[in-house]
Regions:
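Extended alpha-helical scaffolding segments used for macromolecular assembly and cargo binding
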Residues: 1-53, 57-60, 69, 73-76
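Internal alpha-solenoid helical repeat scaffolds
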Residues: 45-169
Length: 169
């Protein structure tokens, strides 16, 4: 596939464009160790030119329980944003908001903290998330997800209202 071809040819810019366009769909089907290996070969300077690809990779790292690597990518994303002040305000807001959404998953079972990050994302974003598919709402179509996040006896109604308010993206 394209990722292998671009890696073998050393065309890491094209590889980053594929990751960005794919938005993590293909990555989810790959062996995480392969993606980590490719990521290790990709020059940081190239990665920093593709902040959306970094965000897609951050989400993949979360899915694969590679939290230290996710946080390393977050630092690289922050450096990328600092190095590109020329980004249009709308694009910058969308990227920063997407980052907040991805980071919110680190606050599993803490609706208040997740909500804070979701609200921050909503204030910054003008488009739906690229790396997080919103079909099925915040429970991703699974009632068991609701039960994972519900934590206060008698508080379900207010928790649902809080999530509905802060999850437009």
């Amino acid at each position: 596939h394209a990722l292998s071809a671009y890696r073998k040819s050393g065309n890491f810019a094209a590889l980053c464009r594929v990751v960005q366009e794919d938005a993590g769909i293909l990555l989810a089907s790959l062996d995480p160790s392969l993606v980590l290996e490719v990521l290790g070969q990709c020059p940081k300077e190239v990665l920093k030119e593709y902040p959306l690809a970094i965000l897609v990779l951050m989400r993949s790292m979360f899915n694969w329980r590679q939290i230290p690597k996710m946080l390393e990518l977050k630092a690289l994303f922050s450096a990328s944003m600092e190095e590109h002040p020329e980004l249009p305000a709308e694009e910058r807001g969308n990227l920063l908001g997407e980052c907040d959404l991805i980071q919110s998953f680190l606050f599993y079972n803490n609706i208040t903290e997740m909500s804070r990050l979701h609200r921050s994302a909503s204030q910054q974003m003008s488009r739906p998330s690229v790396s997080i598919r919103s079909q099925g709402g915040w429970t991703f179509g699974s009632p068991s997800v609701l039960m994972m996040f519900h934590r206060e006896p008698g508080g379900l109604k207010s928790e649902l209202a809080e999530m509905d308010e802060c999850m437009p993206h």
